Amino acid sequence: MEGWQRAFVLHARPWSETSLIIDLFSEESGRVRVVAKGARRKRSNLKGALQPFTPLLVRWSGRGDVKNLTSAEAVSLALPLSGITLYSGLYVNELVARVLEPETRFSELFFDYLHCIQALAGASGSPEPALRRFELALLGHLGYGVDFLHCAGTGDEVDDAMTYRYREEKGFIASLVIDNTSFTGRQLKALATREFPDVDTLRAAKRFTRMALKPYLGGKPLKSRELFRQFVPKKRPLPPEGETA
């Protein structure tokens, strides 16, 4: 690779006694796996920079599936995530690492990711709106095109008070049946604008994104969810799956 790229660390794991294998999300090359030689040494200049949620400038070399990281510099301090927002950020990182094909450019998604992490870092309330917006953006970049504003059966604009059932590869069709695939016109309009003014629209957004992301994630559970279970006190109720890690 020639030149520098903006990037974030999605995941890192030890490799040999002194090095790391790192999944990066870069602006121009998408998800890239690199080996950071010597990054685990106490005096390594890379050790402090290669942390999740730290904006980086990176360079690498090589043509195989795993590149050699040659340079990495922190552009700024890590975005401050803690508690529920930290687990939300880990969920976002795992989602990107799981669903993106390696070395495929997703420049617009890179900025959607950045905006999501910034929103989580600045969140004073629930992280859910930021998570739902990112999930919808991710689905759009994956080619999951859905018309939320028109009935797939008639072409008419959705009505706030009517119910529509989702049909894969078709869209939303007016229906009297209410089940887990049903949404009101009001909820669909919220999905289209990615604005969720209340609990009802947030829950509908979570329900839709869980359903839409399932084929990309397969049956393998998200590790970030298990981390949440492990570190959050048991007396505190767990958020529904997909809200955070």
From Swiss-Prot:
Keyword Signal: no
Domain of life, source organism: Bacteria
Single GO biological process annotation from the record: DNA recombination
Keywords noted in UniProt: DNA damage, DNA recombination, DNA repair
Gene Ontology cellular-component annotations: bacterial nucleoid
InterPro entries documented for this protein: ARFGAP/RecO, DNA_rep/recomb_RecO_N, NA-bd_OB-fold, RecO, RecO_C
PANTHER family, sorted: DNA REPAIR PROTEIN RECO (PTHR33991:SF1)
Family named by the database record: Belongs to the RecO family.
Function noted in UniProt: Involved in DNA repair and RecF pathway recombination.
Protein name according to UniProt: DNA repair protein RecO
Species: Cronobacter sakazakii (strain ATCC BAA-894)
Gene: recO
